[in-house]
Swiss-Prot record:
Keywords of the record: Ribonucleoprotein, Ribosomal protein, RNA-binding, rRNA-binding
Family: Belongs to the universal ribosomal protein uS17 family.
Protein's name in the database: Small ribosomal subunit protein uS17B
Name of the gene encoding the protein in the UniProt record: rpsQ2
Entry function: One of the primary rRNA binding proteins, it binds specifically to the 5'-end of 16S ribosomal RNA.
Presence of the UniProt keyword rRNA-binding in the record: yes
């Protein structure tokens, strides 16, 4: 195995293809719009309990970037994963779902 410092720089080679990481897409309901250009959405997921086998609902809240502030509380929205806007905000508003 070649040590790291002796490996050729592959990213400068024209033959190397750049791989894109598939981005996550989430759907949820807007819970809060009290921050500037940020909304909080709640995403529900159903999962089987590992031991008992019962289907359990889990909820998680995400902060998403809404630059035009077009969301309001109760809207069902779609958001895409993107670069970090802050420590906890790494989703961008895509569109409303009706």
């Amino acid at each position: 195995m070649v040590p790291c410092r002796l490996r050729p720089f592959l990213w400068n080679s024209p033959k190397v293809a750049v791989k894109r990481i598939p981005r996550q897409c989430i759907e949820g309901i807007v819970v809060s719009t009290k921050m500037q250009k940020t909304v909080v959405i709640e995403v529900e997921r159903t999962k089987k309990h590992p031991k008992y086998g019962k289907t359990v609902q889990y909820t998680k809240k995400y902060k998403i970037h809404d630059p035009l502030e077009e969301c309001s509380v109760g809207d069902r929205v779609l958001a895409h994963e993107t670069r970090h806007f802050s420590k906890t905000k790494y989703f961008r508003f895509y569109r409303k779902l009706y």
